[in-house]
């Protein structure tokens, strides 16, 4: 068991970000900037997921854990449904991985349900998949393999 845990630990490299669902992205960016001094380091629209998002940096270390603000492009998007059901707040925690294919294969072998059959494009050229909340104590867990240049 210890060797299995050690091999899994080597696949996970950091807490990548905490995702927060918001109704108004511009308003949330301003609040996090004014309140905590967080700076936007990346912003994009992901039409496939129906979301407009911004990554905010904490401190000077670009590789440190970031805050991801997520606003829906339409009410029926995953973030739109989350806001309708739960209101604004923490929507996910994301772990940075070195090899998302190896991680998903290992998790599936252990009986963990993932939302996608194969990793999909994520923020800033990353590849992502999600562990189903039923398998993670009610938490939506995102797995993020950063883009090669990150």
Predicted segment positions?
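Vicinal oxygen chelate
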Residues: 2-11, 15-23, 54-59, 73-74, 79-150, ...
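Acidic/proline-rich low-complexity IDRs
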Residues: 4, 24, 37, 69, ...
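N-terminal hydrophobic or amphipathic segments with adjacent small-residue motifs
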Residues: 13, 31, 44, 81-83, ...
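Conserved short beta-strand elements that form part of the metal-binding/catalytic scaffold
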Residues: 38-84, 124-148
């Amino acid at each position: 068991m210890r060797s299995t845990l050690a091999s899994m630990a080597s696949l996970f490299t950091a807490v990548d970000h905490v995702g927060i669902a918001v109704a108004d992205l511009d308003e949330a960016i301003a609040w996090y900037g004014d309140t905590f001094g967080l700076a936007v380091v990346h912003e994009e629209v992901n039409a496939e997921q129906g979301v407009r998002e911004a990554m905010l940096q904490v401190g000077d270390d670009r590789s440190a854990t970031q805050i991801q603000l997520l606003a829906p492009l339409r009410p029926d998007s995953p973030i739109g449904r989350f806001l309708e059901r739960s209101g604004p707040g923490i929507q996910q925690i994301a772990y940075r991985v070195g090899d998302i294919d190896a991680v998903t294969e290992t998790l599936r072998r252990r009986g963990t349900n993932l939302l996608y059959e194969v990793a999909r494009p994520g923020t800033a050229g990353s590849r992502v998949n999600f562990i189903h909340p039923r398998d993670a104590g009610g938490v939506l867990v995102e797995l993020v393999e950063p883009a090669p240049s990150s």
